[in-house]
Every structure is written in structure tokens, then in C-alpha cells.
């Protein structure tokens, strides 16, 4: 007892870290899986025998021939068809247009000239193809507009700040119409005959013509008395 160092009376103090003995856990209820034995099996329990059913392996066919689903003709054998020879009669072919082959009179051997005899090489200079150049719609020098050197439109030039002066806005000013009502000129003058005593009104018709017949009748000049050759006399009285 004399060799031990006296540290004083023990007093309760706060531990520096958590002590596992002070907490209650699940205990040995859970076990870690073992590294030996069967997979997904508790080693503390007996294990019954287990069997696995494998899949059926595919059948290997020695020959790939047609099965009963194909209908083989009855006269077909290994050496060919058994039976009498058979022939097919086709229809008459349609008449095709005759080939228009040029005759001897269509050829002009006298125009061959140097083609049939050895001659020096000859070259042909083709004219300038204006058709292709005409289709190229390329803008000319006058189609390009050179940017102005004034203002802020030149990218490579330093310009002073520019300001725009806008017109006076009616919003918030004394000219703003907050009521949105029409003025005196928006109303039309009402006819006083509507709300006052209406005076008598008369209508004047046009001049009326007496009724007359509009048929065209012959006048005195339409009759030729001198051309009458026979006239019926008066009827006698009985």
C-alpha cells in the first residue's frame, strides 16, 4: 500500500467518449455471415439436402432435312420425277415493232475523206460557255454598302457615346386621359323633332299625265287613196 500513489477521492466525471457498456444493443441476435460453409445458410441450423433442376439441353440434329410439314409430290423420287413426259404450250408472242435499220442508201462513204486514211492530229477549240457564267448570280461591286465612318456602327473605330431624344410621353403627364371618356366632339347632334313637338310635313308629288293609249296607229299620210282600184259599194235595202 505504501508504493501506490494516492490520487485523491474518486468523484464522478463526464467521460471523454461514448462507452459501449452504457448502451443497450441487440446483442448476439444478429450474426455475421461465415466465410466457410454454404451460401445463405445459418451454420447453427441443420441443413437439409437440396437439388437443382437444370434446363434441357438442345437436341443436336444430324441432318437438316424437311419434316412432315412439307408436301412432297407422289411422283417425286430420289432420281427425279416418275411419269410420262409433259409439255407446255405457250401462247403466241405479240408482234413487236420492226427494227428500223438504215439501208445502204443511208451511208455516205465519200464524206469520210481523211478518216479512212492516216492523218495528222487535229484539235477543236470550243467556244466560251456563257451559259454557266450567266447562271452564277454573284453580286457585283455596287451591291455592297460601305459602312459609315460616323456614329457607333463601325466596329473597329472608337466613337463617342450617342443619345436619342424621344418624344414626350402622355403617360404620367397632364395630357394623360385617366377617365378614358369621349369628348364633346364624339357625340352627334340629335334631331330636335325627336324630343320636341313635331311640325306637320307635306310631300309634293310630281306632275301626273292623263291616261292615254300608247299604241302606234297610222296617221293620214299613211293612207294612199289614189291607189285604190276597187271599192265595195253600199248595201242595198230590201
UniProtKB/Swiss-Prot annotation:
Localized where?
A: Cell projection, Cilium, Flagellum
Q: Would I find Cytoplasm among this entry's keywords?
A: no
- Spans of the STPGR repeats are 182-207
User: Which Gene Ontology cellular-component terms appear in the entry?
Assistant: motile cilium
UniProt keyword terms in alphabetical order: Cell projection, Cilium, Flagellum
* Family designation: Belongs to the CIMAP family.
Its recorded name reads Ciliary microtubule associated protein 1B
Species: Mus musculus (Mouse)
Amino acid at each position: 500500500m505504501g508504493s501506490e500513489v494516492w490520487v485523491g477521492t474518486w468523484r464522478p466525471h463526464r467521460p471523454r467518449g461514448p462507452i459501449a457498456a452504457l448502451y443497450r444493443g441487440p446483442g448476439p441476435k444478429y450474426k455475421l455471415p461465415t466465410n466457410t460453409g454454404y451460401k445463405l445458410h445459418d451454420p447453427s441450423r441443420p441443413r437439409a439436402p437440396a437439388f437443382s433442376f437444370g434446363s434441357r439441353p438442345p437436341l443436336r440434329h444430324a441432318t437438316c432435312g424437311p419434316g412432315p410439314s412439307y408436301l412432297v409430290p407422289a411422283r417425286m423420287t430420289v432420281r427425279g420425277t416418275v411419269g410420262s413426259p409433259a409439255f407446255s404450250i405457250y401462247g403466241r408472242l405479240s408482234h413487236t415493232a420492226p427494227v428500223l435499220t438504215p439501208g445502204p442508201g443511208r451511208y455516205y462513204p465519200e464524206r469520210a475523206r481523211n478518216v479512212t486514211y492516216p492523218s495528222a492530229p487535229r484539235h477543236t477549240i470550243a467556244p466560251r460557255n456563257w451559259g454557266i457564267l450567266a447562271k452564277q448570280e454573284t453580286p457585283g461591286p455596287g451591291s455592297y454598302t460601305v459602312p459609315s465612318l460616323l456614329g457607333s456602327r463601325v466596329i473597329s473605330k472608337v466613337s463617342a457615346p450617342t443619345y436619342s431624344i424621344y418624344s414626350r410621353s402622355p403617360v404620367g403627364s397632364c395630357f394623360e386621359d385617366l377617365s378614358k371618356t369621349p369628348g364633346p366632339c364624339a357625340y352627334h347632334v340629335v334631331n330636335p323633332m325627336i324630343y320636341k313637338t313635331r311640325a306637320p310635313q307635306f310631300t309634293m308629288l310630281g306632275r301626273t299625265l292623263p291616261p292615254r293609249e300608247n299604241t302606234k296607229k297610222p296617221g293620214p299620210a299613211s293612207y294612199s287613196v289614189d291607189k285604190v282600184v276597187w271599192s265595195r259599194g253600199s248595201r242595198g235595202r230590201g
